[in-house]
Regions:
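Flexible helix-coil transition and linker loops at the boundaries of alpha-helical arrays
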Residues: 2-12
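Conserved aromatic-histidine-acidic binding/catalytic patches
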Residues: 11, 37, 44, 206-213
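Hydrophobic alpha-helical segments with strong N-terminal bias
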Residues: 9, 120, 203-206
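A structural signal for long alpha-helical coiled-coils and helix-turn connectors
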Residues: 3-4, 27, 53, 228-229
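C-terminal substrate/ligand-recognition segments
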Residues: 145-230
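An aromatic- and glycine-enriched ligand-binding surface/loop that stacks and positions planar moieties
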Residues: 13-175
Length: 230
């Protein structure tokens, strides 16, 4: 009761909906974490999920709306870390720089966004990508893969080392391998599926304005379903 009610005005705050969601998550994993208490843990999961479901949250008809540039309007969001495209990182606000962390420095030519010089960083583990069925809409909606085409020319994008920018699912590297002096141009720097779940704004430069939903209603439905089965 000490948490504020789950209202639009309290978006981004730790509301009652967030509190019940966290309790459900804790009870669901209590056994794995070695936590003991009186009562049936799975019934407590169900009870807390039911409380969240009664608060007026709604599943978005299009799941991608939860990751759009304007996802602060999602009726599914329960607890969100909020971001703004105007965040500088120098004003006490953490910037959302997912695009810098995952995109190749020439992906912007294919995506039609302003941001260039991204850091060519993280990519998904191949085993994880292959968990998705090829016909699952979430596959293409989550990962950026394949040959990148320049929107302005219609031709394949070439990296600075004269290789076609083709994001393969497999990654040509050995985890933990120490640098052996190989020339950077010989490294398959375009390998790996990049994160494509959050929408990239066309005018994106240094900071993304998409919020990060820590809890959303879909998670509540899945937790209740697991508790009922277990």
């Amino acid at each position: 009761d000490i948490c504020p009610p789950a209202t639009t005005e309290n978006y981004g705050s730790f509301t009652q909906g967030a509190a019940y969601s966290l309790l459900a998550k804790l009870y669901l994993n209590a056994e794995a974490w070695g936590v003991t208490f009186s009562g049936n843990a799975y019934q407590k999961v169900i009870d807390n999920c039911d409380k969240v479901m009664a608060m007026g949250y709604i599943l978005e008809p299009n799941w991608k709306d939860n990751f759009s540039v304007t996802n602060e309007n999602s009726k599914e969001a329960i607890l969100a870390a909020t971001f703004s495209s105007s965040d500088t990182g120098n004003d006490g606000n953490v910037k959302n720089e997912l695009h810098n962390n995952t995109l190749h420095y020439k992906d912007y030519l294919s995506l039609g966004i302003t941001a260039s010089g991204t850091w060519n960083g993280i990519c998904a583990q191949p085993e994880y990508v292959r968990l998705f069925d090829e016909e699952d809409a979430r596959l293409d909606g989550t990962f950026l893969t394949g040959l990148m085409i320049d929107k302005s020319t219609g031709k394949p994008i070439m990296t600075d080392h004269n290789n076609e920018l083709n994001h393969t699912i497999d990654v040509n590297m050995i985890p933990g391998m120490e640098y052996d002096g190989t020339n950077w141009s010989a490294v398959e720097q375009h390998d790996g599926a990049r994160c494509f779940k959050w929408e990239f704004a066309s005018d994106l430069t240094s900071s993304m304005g998409n919020d990060f939903h820590i809890f959303r209603l879909a998670d509540i439905y899945l937790m209740k379903a697991e508790a009922l089965l277990r």
